[in-house]
From Swiss-Prot:
Entry keyword set: Metal-binding, Ribonucleoprotein, Ribosomal protein, RNA-binding, rRNA-binding, Zinc, Zinc-finger
Gene: rpl24e
One GO MF term attached to the UniProt entry: structural constituent of ribosome
Keyword rRNA-binding: yes
Cellular compartments per GO CC: ribonucleoprotein complex; ribosome
Role this protein plays: Binds to the 23S rRNA.
Family: Belongs to the eukaryotic ribosomal protein eL24 family.
One protein family per Pfam: Ribosomal_L24e
Assembly: Part of the 50S ribosomal subunit. Forms a cluster with proteins L3 and L14.
Cofactor note: Binds 1 zinc ion per subunit.
GO biological process: translation
Protein name: Large ribosomal subunit protein eL24
Length: 68
């Protein structure tokens, strides 16, 4: 059974054979599920500030727990 990839920007799982794989000069491998994620990553956008990313949703839950 093939292993699903996880987007390095938004955290979404996607099928093998789709998306893009980017290898940095230091050897770190980044997977992107869409061109939107790839462009946002290279523009330097913070995924914790975008509502549609998993990082935002996790940070939101942590903020809610601290308030209680």
């Amino acid at each position: 059974m093939p292993r699903w990839n996880v987007c390095s920007y938004c955290g979404r799982e996607f099928e093998p054979g789709t998306g893009k794989m980017f290898v940095r000069n230091d050897g770190r491998v980044l997977f992107f599920c869409s061109s939107k994620c790839e462009k946002y990553y290279f523009m330097g956008r913070n995924p914790r500030k975008l509502k549609w990313t998993k990082a935002f949703q996790e940070a939101r839950l942590q903020r809610a727990k601290r308030r209680k």
